[in-house]
């Protein structure tokens, strides 16, 4: 009986010792577990880790322009731009040190600055202004962020009011595997 008990304990120990460790197995995830052998679906992703290539920019809102109180323009704006030559920003790269660079279609650096995230708000400090964008989607392959642009003013008797939501939809252009393994 004692031998049977030892045999049962030994077999139980072998089966529990052979259990695969679960965790995030994606190397660009913020919670990557190099010891995990089985992906448990828990991967969380950051805005860093490759560049974001803009696929479309959606704009919706309204604009009014009046002259001496008389409406000249009263428009509802609603369109989506997908032509790569017209997308601005085209390519954004966010680094782990909280810096970013923007590149055009020829991969020429257009500007750079700093960034931070608090909750679902991405704050981008450009050379001449600070932008606050709401992160709608952020996963391994997709980034969607929205900024609300509100401007109003009067110049030479012409008054304008603009209220536009601009949504940028981008896909991740991942760094090479070798770059990730070097980390």
Predicted features and spans:
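Sec-dependent N-terminal signal peptides
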Residues: 4-13
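C-terminal motif of bacterial Sec signal peptides marking the signal peptidase cleavage site
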Residues: 15-17
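Lipid interaction determinants
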Residues: 45-110, 118-183
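A detector of repeated loop/turn-to-beta-strand junctions in beta-rich toroidal repeat architectures
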Residues: 40, 109-112
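Primarily marks secretory-pathway-exposed extracellular/lumenal segments that are disulfide-
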Residues: 6, 19-46, 87, 172, ...
